[in-house]
Amino acid sequence: MRVSVPVLALAFGSLAAAAPNAGRRTCGSVPPPEFFEASEKVAALEESGAFADLQAPIEVETYFHVVASSRSERDGYISDQMLSDQIRVMNEDYAPHGVHFNLRETTRTINPSWASDGNEIAMKRSLRKGGYAALNVYFLKDLGGALGYCYFPTNAAPGSTTFIRDGCSVLSSSVPGGSGAPYDLGKTATHEVGHWMGLFHTFQGGCSGQGDYVSDTPPQRSPSSGCPVGRDSCPGGGVDPIHNYMDYSVDSCMNQFTRGQGTRMSSMWRQFRAGK
């Protein structure tokens, strides 16, 4: 796996990014040690049944921020219909696991620097809405080759830099109807929000160790490319989860989270975000 490590990724509440390269996604995600430890503890609590009575539906207060360099779609000024289709895709993808995104407001900003992912903290300090349980998605024209990135949940003090930068940045051309084929069906937002909800990539850890700390996702040596049906990169553990939203298949190949991932999202939500 080729890893590009942004400076921001070295802090807790780490960056998780996906970038297209030669027709496939690559990863610049560097989950911090604290999040591995938190995932291991949450997995143990799930195994013990400690979260069994906490699997109620999750309603996520959601804000969309369109940040473009001009009022042209090619410069990132995506339409209301595209945004409506994006929230619909997210809700369809998460509905089987009791998660619903309630789009409260959409903001639109013309700022060429911000639209190219410049001055991230200044942008988010200006635009961010809600508490730590609120999902802020920033649709940007250019992410330096990336499709998107998100921050993992942590214990963030209100008003801190970790709190301000929380949320997801998504390439505007990846929304439904965008120009970013084969990543133009809205699955980038689904994938990135999975990190915001506390999920690793399915290929985390390769064929050994704890992997993604979710027991029902088969081990996977490396990210998928395209839609390689029948791929089995870790013999003995089952075929690779190429249809999982947390792999790197093309959008048309993605169609599921596992039951265990749904449980993990619920557990992480209640551990880090609920009521905050």
Curated annotation (Swiss-Prot):
Keywords assigned: Disulfide bond, Hydrolase, Metal-binding, Metalloprotease, Protease, Secreted, Signal, Virulence, Zinc
Broad class of the protein's primary localization: secreted
Signal peptide: 1-18
Record-annotated membrane-spanning stretches: none
Binding-site residues for Zn(2+), renumbered to this chain: 191, 195
Top-tier EC class: hydrolase
Region described as Disordered: 211-233
Keyword Protease in record: yes
Catalytic residue list: 192
Entry-linked InterPro entries: MetalloPept_cat_dom_sf, Peptidase_M43
Disulfide bond residue pairs: 227-253
Protein EC: 3.4.24.-
Record GO terms (molecular function): metal ion binding; metallopeptidase activity
Induction line: Peaks of expression occur during the endosporulation stage.
GO cellular component: extracellular region
Domain of life per record: Eukaryota
A Pfam match: Peptidase_M43
GO aspect biological process, one term: proteolysis
Subcellular location field: Secreted
The keyword Magnesium is annotated on this UniProt entry: no
Family from the record: Belongs to the peptidase M43B family.
PANTHER family: METALLOPROTEASE MEP1 (AFU_ORTHOLOGUE AFUA_1G07730)-RELATED, PTHR47466
Protein name: Extracellular metalloprotease 1
Source organism of the structure: Coccidioides posadasii (strain C735)
